[in-house]
Amino acid sequence: MITLISFSSLGLGFLGPVYAIFVVRNFSASLFHAGILSAVFLLTSAIFKMPAGKLVDKYGKWKILFIGLIGCGLSSLSYIFAFDIIHLYAIEFIYGISFAFQRPALLALMAVVSNKPSRGMLLGIFDSVDDISGAFAAVVSGAVVSSLGFDMLFFICFFCYFISGLFILKTREKIN
């Protein structure tokens, strides 16, 4: 479980600290545009989390989580092919939907693997691992972009989501 949480958190965490720089530098956009793009991601995610939660109940947490991770990975990779700011709006919308699928499924999975006497502790560990992964990603993302460029960072994000997807395929039978 920790591996799944870590790699999926890294996938998104690598983008956060440098995303505005990517938008401004590569699209001659303003920081205002970067803020709007982030808002598109967050609002889309917020709107689609409840329907995604219903899909988790109907089709199962593993399938929906896998779909969300694949969507997040492909969204990360698609930044490489964006050449107009309108492409970024489309990517943020799709990324938001994908993240919306991922999060309720992951939370449902956490509820299943935790037992009642230690549920709070396990959820605390989950949140701590999520935050630690994000902190690590914040430091590493700047170094990666400075030395290897944005494209490499997007490949790394994709790879993190890909590893999470493989983890799901490997462990879904063990935890249910």
Can you say where each PLM-predicted feature lies in the sequence?
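Helix-loop boundary and gating motifs at the non-cytosolic
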Residues: 1-42
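Loop-to-transmembrane helix entry/capping segments in MFS-fold secondary transporters
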Residues: 31-32, 116-126
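Residue-level signature of mid-helix packing/kink "hotspots" within the transmembrane helices
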Residues: 42-50, 134-135
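Helix-to-loop junctions at the C-terminal end of transmembrane segments
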Residues: 48-60, 145
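Structural signature of the two symmetry-related core transmembrane helices
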Residues: 63-77, 158
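Helix-loop junctions at membrane interfaces in 12-TM secondary transporters
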Residues: 80-91
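Intracellular juxtamembrane helix-capping segments at the cytosolic ends
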Residues: 101-114
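A membrane-interface helix-boundary motif in multi-pass transporters
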Residues: 146-160
